[in-house]
Amino acid sequence: MREYLLGNVAIAKGILEAGAGVVSGYPGTPSSEIVDYLAPLAREQGVHVEWSVNEKVAMEVAIGASWTGTRSAVTMKHVGLNVAADPFMTLAYLGVGGGMVVISADDPYCHSSQNEQDSRRYAAFARVPCLDPADPQEARDMTLRAFALSEEFGVPVMLRPTTRVSHARADVLVGTPTERLAGPQFEKNPARRVALPVHARPLHVELLNKQAGIEAALEKEAWNRSVVRSEVGVIASGISGLYAEEAIAGMEAEVSLLRIGTYPISRKVVGDFLEKVSRVLVVEEMDPIVEEFVEMVAKERNPDVE
């Protein structure tokens, strides 16, 4: 079924389709409409939806639900992740039970924010996957995939919509809500759930050992795709990939394009593209995360690329 949806509503639909049982959040543009949409449906859908007193509490509510085997999501704007950073960073070590998605909506150009910090930095800091949607359809699709990735690797997964994705409207293909599993069950396991140094050290090693598998899984995602037309190339992430596609089409230019939608970025995907171009322009919103990665890979795969 197709519906004309706001990006944030597409994310909310994805949460319902994934069968999440708990959604918590703290309001802040550009993320607020996710909980706004879900709250009136909570009783009908059998989902616990709440505005928490702050982002840290919202994060901990979602963590608690996840540890009972319930899929959960937490929503906030980018600066809210500062408030929630303590439990977020430690959760990467302790891991999840049911899939858990952390939705941190960034605000390039400070439309309604005090800074332009980039949530992708937090994902890299915590060593967890981050999905960067370019439009409302990708926002819905990535939400569904994020829950599956979270359960596959036992870590939270970040969804990072930006303002023009959260507040754009588009025709979105949606499905029906997934039936939730049996009631929540909490299993006492101090070695995995109590963040003492004696537990954290081996869990850190475990997290590091997951990184190769995470990168290999993300490498195969359709959101990382390229078209090679000439030796002049553009590498763009998130909604910047749409901007690049429109610009190239408008100029009727023979320009190669690699679109990036997932982090950590695949060395192979970027390296293979760099070997086919002699000049490259990187386009992304906010911090030069893709640019820094491209520079690093270029030294190995194509040192002469401009």
Which functions belong to the PLM regions below?
Residues 1-136, 164, 226-228, 254, ...:
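Thiamine diphosphate
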Residues 1-8, 12, 18, 133-306:
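Flexible, low-complexity linker and terminal segments
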